[in-house]
Design a protein with these regions (language model features):
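Short glycine/proline- and charge-enriched loop/turn segments
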Residues: 166-175
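Conserved N-terminal segment of class I S-adenosyl-L-methionine
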Residues: 1-118, 122-124, 135-142, 158, ...
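Short catalytic micro-motifs in class I SAM-dependent methyltransferases
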Residues: 126-131
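Helix-to-beta-strand junctions that scaffold the AdoMet/dcAdoMet cofactor pocket
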Residues: 132-133, 148-149
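Feature marks short, surface-exposed loop/turn motifs that line or immediately flank catalytic pockets
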Residues: 160-162
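Short, well-ordered secondary-structure micro-motifs
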Residues: 96, 164-165
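Conserved helix-to-beta-strand junction in the class I
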Residues: 143-147
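Conserved beta-strand signature within the Rossmann-like core of class I S-adenosyl-L-methionine
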Residues: 149-158
Length: 224
């Protein structure tokens, strides 16, 4: 993909409307292998992830950006982690457990006014960026760096075989809202240009499933 093709693809992208993410999206039978957002289902899928988040990052205050119905938030809450969430869909609050419902703010993940700067020592953004346009990904990366004081932990779907740095694709066979699968190096570059450094040591600890979908970044202290 050359720069002209990249530009046109970006201009052609259309954001997914928040109303698409209703209860059917999160809990419907369309999800492969029962991969829905019921709490006990997520508990099995998450396995040791909540414990790793607590132990690897040792956070005092966590933001789950694009938290969905808050299943990971609930599992972290059970471990005594102080966690808040942001999600685009009103259904996320409705489907969340009572323990975390009031900790979820409904809003756009790229909104620079939604939370204060440096308010969290860990910002989590998992399985979110593939649902955004490339321009929205750029905005969301900047917002994550703004809101964290230390670490960012990201998982997303990446282009399985990019031709170059600019190349991105879709994954409609898995989810019709998977509109952006970036080159992994492109996403890392976005964070580096916002003033972060990669933490491959922490990525290795968090990617215990060896899926190759984890990024961990540390904000450089001099960044505002």
């Amino acid at each position: 993909m050359n720069i002209t093709e990249f530009e046109q693809r970006i201009l052609d992208q259309k954001p997914v409307e928040s109303g698409h993410y209703d209860s059917e999206y999160f809990t419907g039978d369309w999800r492969a292998e029962g991969n829905n957002y019921n709490l006990e289902t997520r508990r099995q899928i998450e396995a040791k992830n909540p414990f790793l988040i607590r132990d690897v990052f040792q956070p005092k205050k966590v933001l789950d950006l694009g938290c969905g119905p808050g299943a990971l938030m609930h599992l972290l809450w059970e471990l005594g982690v102080n966690v808040e969430g942001i999600d685009f869909a009103e259904s996320s609050r409705q489907l969340a457990t009572p323990q975390v419902r009031d900790r979820i703010t409904v809003g756009y993940v790229g909104d620079l006014g939604i939370k204060p700067a440096n308010a969290y020592d860990l910002v989590i953004c998992r399985e979110v960026l593939e649902h955004l346009t490339v321009l929205q990904v750029k905005q969301t990366v900047a917002n994550m760096v703004r809101m964290t004081s230390k670490f960012i932990y990201v998982t997303t779907r990446f282009h399985p075989n990019p031709s170059n740095l600019l190349d991105f694709t879709t994954q409609f066979d898995v989810d019709p809202t998977h509109i952006t699968l970036l080159n992994k190096d492109m996403l890392r570059l976005m964070f580096v240009l916002e003033g972060c450094r990669s933490r491959p040591d922490l990525e290795a600890r968090m990617d215990w499933g060896n899926k190759g979908r984890v990024l961990v970044l540390e904000k450089i202290a001099s960044q505002p």
